[in-house]
Each structure stands twice: as C-alpha cells, then as structure tokens.
Amino acid sequence: MNIRNLGATAFLLFLFSCRPAGCCGDFTEAERTLIRESDSIMRVLTIENAADNMVLRAKSSDLSGKALLSSDYERLAELMVATVTHPSQDGVGIAGPQVGLNRRVVAVQRFDKEPVLCDGKPDHPFEVYPNIHIICMSDSQAYGPEGCLSVPDRSADVLRSQRVVIEYTDMSRLKHLERKYGKGACNYPLPTIRDTVSGFTAVIFQHEIDHLEGILYIDRLQ
C-alpha cells in the first residue's frame, strides 16, 4: 500500500465472526530460489503484467514452523521491508504475493506505535507478520484514500472497517521453542498472538491481508 495519509476518525468497539487458520507448508524450491537470488530488494509485481496478475489473484497459504525458522524466511522478511521502504516504492505495507510468493506474510508500518530511528531519522516502525489472518472486523466503517504498489499510478477511496483483530504466528515464542527443543519445535502447534488495531494502521492491515486472498483494493470500489 502506498497512500500515507488518512484522516483521524472516532473509533468504536465491537463483536464479529471468526476465521479458522489454513494449512501450513514449507517453502518450495522455486520460492527459495526467488528469495536467495533477490538482491537488496525484490521486484514488485503489477497488474499490468499478465503473469504477475495471476500471482496477485491467487490465494496465499501459511508457512510451517520449519519454514519460519529457516534463514530463507529471515531473508524474506528483510527483503520485504527493504522493498517497501525503498525510495522507488515508498510504501506503508507490502504482502507476499506482491513480491512473487503466495504466502501469508505481510510487512506493515505501525503508525500506531512510537517512532524509532531509521537511517538516523525517526519514523514509525515496519513489522513483519507471518501466517496472518483477520479474526474480527468492526461494523463501524469509513472511506479513506488508498493506493497500491501493484496498481501503479492510481488511487481511490475505499470503505474499510475502523478496527480489526489480527492473529499471526508469534515468532518470539516459536524461537523459544526452537531453543528449548531444537528441530523438535516444528512438531508443536505454531504459537499465535492476537492484536487489536485501529485507525490508519487497521486500514493497512486490511489492504495487505486482502492481497493474501487474491483481492486488490480496486475490487472494492463501488
């Protein structure tokens, strides 16, 4: 996502339906090759390319514990942040399909958190979320401007929920299991964590998680 401004809105709290997690899998050889052969940033797929569009329109799957504990995942997380923050993109979020991997991984700038130093300048931090799903969405919605790295030179107002509950794999706990059990950590259920997010950051999460379902913001225009 590459629209950085959204007006402040009043937020309410609510109850909603839940979504079960999908199946997990290891990186394929093609995915490992893509990650390992990428330089400092990855190519961003766009709808202007037919082959790219097929990837952008496909649903993404979760990663296994083995994949998440691999150097390939660590490298992927670094590359996704480097790509979305590169001056050629200057985005606020990016999803796996946008860099060629139909995996449920997103990198999101947390405007709801305190700024940190980045290249000597204070800015809101980017964080990477593996196996992410939206569990609950608020009934309260609002329109706001959105753009997309994969839909060049366009923007539009999109109706989004003002608050969401997300669930994703807790990498800190997963790494703790690895330290405790070694490779046996992969035999345990993946530890998860939930987070309630509101405001502009909630909009970014919805936009990026849409990508994991093969949905682009232009599909939501009325």
Question: Could you say what each language-model-derived stretch is?
Answer:
Residues C18-Q222:
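Positively charged
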Residues M1-D26:
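Bacterial Sec-dependent N-terminal signal peptides
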